[in-house]
């Protein structure tokens, strides 16, 4: 995927000289300049990581069809990785509280391959998750730390997952500005599985050279 096509023709400032404290060196969802500079730096590598994760998930799921819940989906690059591995008719729910400014540009709307046009709010995503009995895939790509620290994620997932026949929990551990956060995320996952183990058995698969994990939960 060529990220440069998405950014082509969009003129933005230089972070090294910009004096805007709300944007300079930070990811500000409402700022097109911030969006573009972030995607220049991280967009391609995030896409590659997501695609590799879905490749591993495909090996585990085989011919089963996933219902993907992408928590903290951003601009939805993981949707492309999902369709490349599971086909264009994959069920995909882009869940985020913030809509990126770049999503309202013609570049985004006309980008090929297609990117998500809508964003589902967190509580609505949890509701849809609770209504999906089989093969729900909960994806947290660089997002589990932030979401778990700012929402009642654990309790909401416990309620949504308790009636499932099976589910997949997919996490690429978060790394921000060389500050590693996987310990917090690993603790969250451990606590979640501990609370669910009375109803489910689990199988774990390390991915991305230990920088991520896929967990299959099957009802007892």
Q: What function would you assign to each model-found segment?
A:
Residues 84-116:
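Class I SAM-dependent methyltransferase SAM/SAH-binding core
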Residues 1-24:
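N-terminal auxiliary segments of SAM/dcSAM-dependent transferases
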Residues 75-87:
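Conserved SAM-binding loop of SAM-dependent methyltransferases across substrates and taxa
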Residues 136-151:
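A short SAM/SAH-binding and catalytic strip from SAM-dependent methyltransferases
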Residues 184-220:
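Class I S-adenosyl-L-methionine
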Residues 165-176:
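Conserved beta-strand signature within the Rossmann-like core of class I S-adenosyl-L-methionine
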Residues 26-60:
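Class I SAM-dependent methyltransferase Rossmann-like catalytic core
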Residues 106-132:
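S-adenosyl-L-methionine
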């Amino acid at each position: 995927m060529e990220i440069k096509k998405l950014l082509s023709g969009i003129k933005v400032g230089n972070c090294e000289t910009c004096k805007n404290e709300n944007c300079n060196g930070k990811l500000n969802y409402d700022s097109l300049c911030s969006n573009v500079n972030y995607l220049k730096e991280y967009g391609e590598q995030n896409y590659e990581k997501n695609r590799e994760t879905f490749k591993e998930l495909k090996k585990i799921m085989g011919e089963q069809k996933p219902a993907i819940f992408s928590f903290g989906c951003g601009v939805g690059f993981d949707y492309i990785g999902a369709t490349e591995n599971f086909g264009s008719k994959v069920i995909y729910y882009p869940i985020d509280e913030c809509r990126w400014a770049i999503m309202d540009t013609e570049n985004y709307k006309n980008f090929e391959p297609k990117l998500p046009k809508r964003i589902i709010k967190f509580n609505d995503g949890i509701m849809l998750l609770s209504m999906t009995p089989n093969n729900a895939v909960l994806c947290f790509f660089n997002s589990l730390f932030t979401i778990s620290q700012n929402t009642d994620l654990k309790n909401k997932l416990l309620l949504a997952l308790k009636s499932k026949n099976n589910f997949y929990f997919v996490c690429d551990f978060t790394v921000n500005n060389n500050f590693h956060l996987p310990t917090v995320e690993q603790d969250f996952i451990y606590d979640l599985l501990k609370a669910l183990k009375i109803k489910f058995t689990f199988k774990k698969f390390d991915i991305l050279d230990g920088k991520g994990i896929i967990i299959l939960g099957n009802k007892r």
